[in-house]
Amino acid sequence: GQLLESHEIPTAAHKGGPHILEKTKQIVASYLEKDSVAGVAISSAGMVDPDKGEIFYAGPQIPNYAGTQFKKEIETSFDIPCEIENDVNCAGLAEAVSGSGKGASVTLCLTIGTGIGGCLIIDGQVFHGFSNSACEVGYLHMQDGAFQDLASTTALVRYVAEAHGDPVEQWNGRRIFKEATEGNKLCMDGIDRMVDYLGKGLANICYVANPEVVILGGGIMG
């Protein structure tokens, strides 16, 4: 396939699941006005049941998102097929098909951001587990807390802000890495702490999954 068009549209996640569903339907409608569309593929945060095409669990960052039935709503409204998958699973599958995991028998993909998401690709297929919640590694219990509460960008920002005595809103990952390169000791300490926890968490996952390739993604990994 060839990418023909690309757009960025604010999610406004704080407005909740019904808003996101309605926004998605508006986007689909806008494309149908211009051209024929063979189908819709949705990559979404949260725990996704790809067979039912719905979100069955989501964190507090997106209110009222659990239960959102994308597949049913899109197919009923527009009479075209719709598939939905977890966003990290989509990223991992893309890496396995045409990226750094191409040709690997077992690929582990983690995305580091607000939390930590995980995906396991086995022989080119997403491993969903019994109830579509496999590789939710952010909730992995470590000695000092949950994995994503220690090694995510959110955790890094919180640590650095507290170390400086600043409100969290004054910091972000980009600023932390920039100031670390300029010699800010507290920023360097925060990054070292994050990398240490990230390494420990990765090691634990690798003990279980034994991946051939490990891929790290997310905003601060660029």
Predicted feature residues:
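Short histidine/acidic/glycine/proline-rich micro-motifs that form metal-
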Residues: 10-15, 61-62, 146-147, 220-222
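Glycine/GP-enriched mid-protein hinge/lid loop-to-helix segment characteristic of carbohydrate kinases
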Residues: 2-7, 15-19, 75-77, 83-85, ...
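Active-site charged/polar residues at nucleotide-handling catalytic sites that mediate phosphoryl
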Residues: 35, 209
